C-alpha cells in the first residue's frame, strides 16, 4: 500500500540491526521502493536484570499490567523508565513504586489541589517560574528521548506543587 510507505521511521531492536540496516534496504531498492527516512534502534527490555525468555518464564504480560494499572500507567512506566536507545529494565516493584509515587501521589495531589482551587472564587495563582520555561525549551531538544522529556515534565509538576505549597491558598480562605 503506497499510502503507508515509505516509513518515516523504521523501528527495530538492536539484535536485528544487520538485517534491517543492510539487507532490508537492499531488498527495497531492488523492488524500486523508497527507503525509510530513518532507522530507530532500541535496546533490549530486561526483567529484573535478566533478558526476557520463554524458557526462564520471565515474560511480561502487558494485559495483566493493563488490567491492574491501566494502559496509560504502562505507557508512562515504559516511557519514563526505559531509555530510548539503551537496554532498559522492567520491574513490577518499580512499576508499583512509580504508580504510587508519581501518578497517585504527586500528579494526583496536584490535580486535586488545582481542581479544588478552581472551584473557589478569587483564588489566583500567578506562577512565573523561569525553570518551567527552560524545561519547555528542553523538550524540543530531546526528541525521541522520552525518559528525558518525562523527567522534565515532572520537574514542572514538582515546581507547580511547590508553588502551591508556598502560596498556601487553604490558609487564605
Residue map of PLM features:
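Secondary-structure transition/capping motifs at alpha-helix termini
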Residues: 2-4, 28-37
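Long, non-coiled-coil amphipathic alpha-helical linker/lever segments
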Residues: 135-147, 154
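Secondary-structure capping and boundary motifs in well-ordered enzyme cores
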Residues: 13-16, 65-66, 95-106, 145-152, ...
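Conserved, charged catalytic cores of large soluble enzymes
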Residues: 1, 111-138, 157-172
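Active-site cores that bind ATP or allylic diphosphates and position pyrophosphate for catalysis
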Residues: 1-14
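Catalytic adenosine-cofactor/nucleotide-binding cores of aminoacyl-tRNA synthetases and other
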Residues: 43-128
Amino acid at each position: 500500500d503506497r499510502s503507508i510507505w515509505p516509513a518515516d521511521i523504521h523501528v527495530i531492536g538492536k539484535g536485528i540491526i544487520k538485517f534491517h540496516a543492510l539487507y532490508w534496504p537492499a531488498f527495497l531498492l531492488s523492488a524500486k521502493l523508497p527507503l525509510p527516512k530513518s532507522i530507530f534502534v532500541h535496546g533490549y527490555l530486561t526483567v529484573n536484570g535478566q533478558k526476557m525468555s520463554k524458557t526462564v518464564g520471565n515474560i511480561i504480560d502487558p494485559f495483566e499490567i493493563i488490567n491492574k494499572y491501566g494502559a496509560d500507567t504502562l505507557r508512562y512506566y515504559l516511557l519514563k523508565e526505559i531509555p530510548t536507545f539503551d537496554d532498559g529494565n522492567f520491574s513490577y516493584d518499580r512499576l508499583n513504586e512509580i504508580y504510587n509515587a508519581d501518578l497517585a501521589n504527586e500528579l494526583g495531589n496536584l490535580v486535586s489541589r488545582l481542581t479544588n482551587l478552581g472551584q473557589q472564587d478569587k483564588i489566583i495563582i500567578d506562577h512565573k517560574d523561569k525553570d518551567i520555561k527552560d524545561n519547555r525549551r528542553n523538550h524540543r531538544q530531546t526528541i525521541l528521548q522520552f525518559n528525558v522529556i518525562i523527567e522534565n515534565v515532572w520537574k514542572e509538576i514538582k515546581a507547580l506543587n511547590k508553588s502551591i505549597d508556598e502560596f498556601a491558598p487553604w490558609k487564605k480562605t
